[in-house]
């Protein structure tokens, strides 16, 4: 079983849904990063259950304890261990599924592979193990923030309800204030109503979560087998319930022409009035001014001056269909990822399954406390996965000193 991810900045997670505790050990974080339990707690609070009607009613404080890696309020370069003790387990709810695998869950595959499988609340396969992701992600985000990198996320779709494209301020301000974590106020209301409708029916619904990383420098990523987008896709797919990943335009590139989606370059400091276009809607706005932009002449510039642009000027792209990554390497534009999250498989509707002990087909109606939609709580997990990968690549590419952040 693989429980560790990352080359330099790495996470080893441990624990299970109904075990004594869940947590993570983080290796590779340089010394002298100011870090407190509160830094991690505020992220865990975004993930914890029982906060509103559209989350699991399981009541957990998810209070984190840092038991190593911090000295005098700063990281000391040694492994950081964060642990959360489980408080509100109801393991008896799961005795009925001991030998009857739940449709949509990993019960059957885990039992087939390992034999000795903790079926209580999904055990190690539960979404609750993402507590470890969030602990590590909180540290990664604190590290990235000190280098001007911000990672944010929001829900863009629940069921068939899609949010309108909103600016970054709405995502940062409004998405954090509503239970659905959506930046479009009107869509957020409709999404919440839809989730409650499915909850009333004993069913669940899926959706899409978008995560954006701002301020990432050009140069992260190690082709051929260490591509930044490859590592991001892997990290995001390793989150439970995620069944698909897109970067930039994603699957829409399959129906596009290169002339439509190639991200054209420009010198940001040379033409300060040019905008960075980060989404599909703004691309059309750019095309209206494209000819005018292309006709600008580099007069009175000799070859020496032109070459200086490569080091003295920031280079941007007029669109961002690539999602901030070209050839497996970051290009300095915002990194944009989206994950498709399946409906929570634990539902109270009657379903067909098999009894592995009796060797016969049977019916199952799942008990327990479950989310009618996991998307709102998975936003912070997606942020964490992206932040962990970026922190690792920042260290691998030399943007962060590996032992002491004050030395860079």
Please place each PLM-identified region on the residue numbering:
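Glycine-rich, mobile lid/loop segments that gate access to catalytic sites or pores
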Residues: 112-224
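Glycine-rich, N-terminal phosphate-binding loop and its surrounding beta-alpha-beta segment
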Residues: 44-103, 107
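Short acidic, glycine/tyrosine-flanked loop/strand segments centered on an H-E-D-like triad
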Residues: 97-123, 352-370
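N-terminal, positively charged regions that mediate nucleic acid binding
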Residues: 1-58
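Alpha-helical support elements that line or immediately flank enzyme active sites
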Residues: 20-32, 128-149, 230-234, 333-335, ...
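Glycine-rich anion/phosphate-binding loop at the beta-strand->alpha-helix junction
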Residues: 13-20, 202-205, 209-279, 292-361
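Internal helix-turn-beta structural module
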Residues: 10, 343-408
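A short glycine/serine-rich beta->alpha loop
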Residues: 10-13, 117-129, 218-222, 320-326, ...
